[in-house]
Amino acid sequence: MRTRITALITGLVLSTAIGLSAQSLPPGKTVTDNGPRTYRFTVEYTNANTKGDIFRRQRLTGDYTRGLPAGDVTWKNVVQQDADGATAPFGAAQKRDFMEGFRYHNDLAATLKPEFFKAFPPAAVFERNLVWDTGMIEDFGQGHFDRLKLNVPLHAGSSDDVTMPGVGVFHNRDIVLEWIGSSQRNGQDCALIQFQAFLNPVEIVNAGITLKGLSNYWGQIWVSTATKQIEYATINETVVGDLKLAGQDTTMTINVIRSGVLEPVTVK
C-alpha cells in the first residue's frame, strides 16, 4: 500500500513539474551561432488613398547574414522593385549598391545613432527599415525570451520615443509580446511569439517630405527552443497620415500597408 502511495505521489510531482515546464521557456539560453547564417528579408509596401485605391507598390528584398566573427552582421543583394496601381507587374530590380557588404556589429541601439547610416543616401528610408526591422525582430524574439510565459502578455515597452536619425520620430505607445504556443520550422521545435503595438504616433521629415500619422504594427516570430535562432518571422504595419510632398502647400491623407517575411536561406 505504501509503495502504491509513494508511486502516486511521485507521479503527481512529475506531472506537476512537466506542466510547469510547459508554461515557461528554457531559462538562461544564449543564441547559438554555429557560423554564419543567411536570411532573406522581403518587404512589400502598398500605398493607397482613403478610398482604398492603390496607386503605388514597392518591394524590397535583401540577404541578411548573422553569426559573423565578433558578433557582426552584413547585408547583400538588396534590391527594390516598383509598380504603379494595384495589379501592374513589378519593374526591374534596382540594386542598392550602398548596402552591398554593409557590415556592422549586431547592436540595435547603435543603429539609432546619427552617424550609423552615414554612407546611405538621405532618402533611403526603406533600406534603413530593413536594418531596424531585423534588429527589432531579433530583440523581440531573443532579447525577451526568458521573460515570456505561455499566453501571458508581456508589456515590453511603453511611451517610448524612438528617434530615427535623418527620418523622424516614432512613439511606441505599448509594445506587447506574447508566447502563444509551439510550432516547428526548419526541423526545429519553436516557440511562437506574437508582437503588436497599436496607435503609435509617427512623424517623418525626410528629403523635403513630411508625414504625420499613426502606425499599427504586429507580427509573429518562430524561435528555436534549442538554439534561440529565429527560424521564421513576419511583420505587418499600417500607417495612416497626412503627407506633404516637397514644394507643395497642400497635404493628402495616405494609407501605407507594409508586410514582410524574414526566413533563413541556410538552415542550421
What are these regions (language model features)?
Residues 1-5:
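Positively charged n-region of N-terminal signal peptides that target proteins for export
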Residues 6-8, 234:
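Short helix-onset patch at the extreme N-terminus, typifying the N->h transition
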Residues 9-19:
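Bacterial N-terminal signal peptides
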Residues 23-268:
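Signature of exported/secreted
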